[in-house]
Amino acid sequence: MDIPKIEHYIYPSTFLRTIEWVFTYPQNKEFEDWKTHTVTSWKKLDQKSKVQVKQEYLDIQTPNYKFSFWSDKCILRFNPDYFTSFGLAVEFIDNLKDYFLSLCGNKIKLSRIRKVNLIPGGREDDDSTNIGFIGCIFSDRFVQKEDNYTEFDQGLVAKITQATFINNGYEVTLNYGFSCNKKDNSQLMGILEISTIDNKICAFSNFIKNAERMNGIIFDIFHWCISDEILAIMKN
């Protein structure tokens, strides 16, 4: 599927709530030793970090990130209020490459980047439908107009659709739709979750470059999916 390329832009405000970067590697048979070394050295690196050593994994957390390490995979979560662009997250990880190289042995098996956007809103009046909210936050090229929704659709209080396709050689999965506030069903939340996956084995240096490409795809798809009205709000 061909998604138009968009020039990169850092918005003053966003609806981004989750930035997650997952990658896998061959099982590290010296993981216990790696944990011991990392616990000691990371506290010197970042004194604000909270380190939790579990039997099967290691958690390192600050207000700006949470990293979870296993013997064969790693989950990195970044605070979007601090990491205002994915480039900052990539730079941060690249500066810690000695930790990751000793963990993965310079061999990445799979990489996935996931971003979740939550867009609050509401029905304009009692005559409008919840499903019509989708047409307000998503572009016409991405979702159908309210007039084309079925009677069943117009009575929904939540709807999440999943779609998977290939873009520039990377697998992309979208989860999108809306849900209602349980206490006030006129208050709605739009949801757009975009994930890109690279399942080609590569060295750490290529893994970093691929992550930048994957994030670029997410950026392009976000712009393709979101309405001009929402993009205008993000510029303020």
Model-based region annotation:
Residues Y57-D81, N175-I201:
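Amphipathic N-proximal alpha-helical interface segments
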Residues P4-E7, L110-M189:
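Aromatic/basic-lined ligand-recognition segments
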Residues S186-N236:
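Long, compositionally biased interface segments
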Residues M1-P80:
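N-terminal low-complexity, intrinsically disordered segments
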Residues Y9, K48-D59, S102-D125, K145-I160, ...:
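Short glycine-rich, low-complexity/disordered patches
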Residues Q27-K35, S85-L88, S128-T129, I201-I208:
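Short, conserved charged micro-motifs
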Residues F23-Q27, Y82, N117-G122, T196-D198:
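Beta-strand elements of well-folded, non-transmembrane domains
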Residues W70-R141:
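Internal, hydrophobic cores of structured domains that mediate oligomerization or house catalytic pockets
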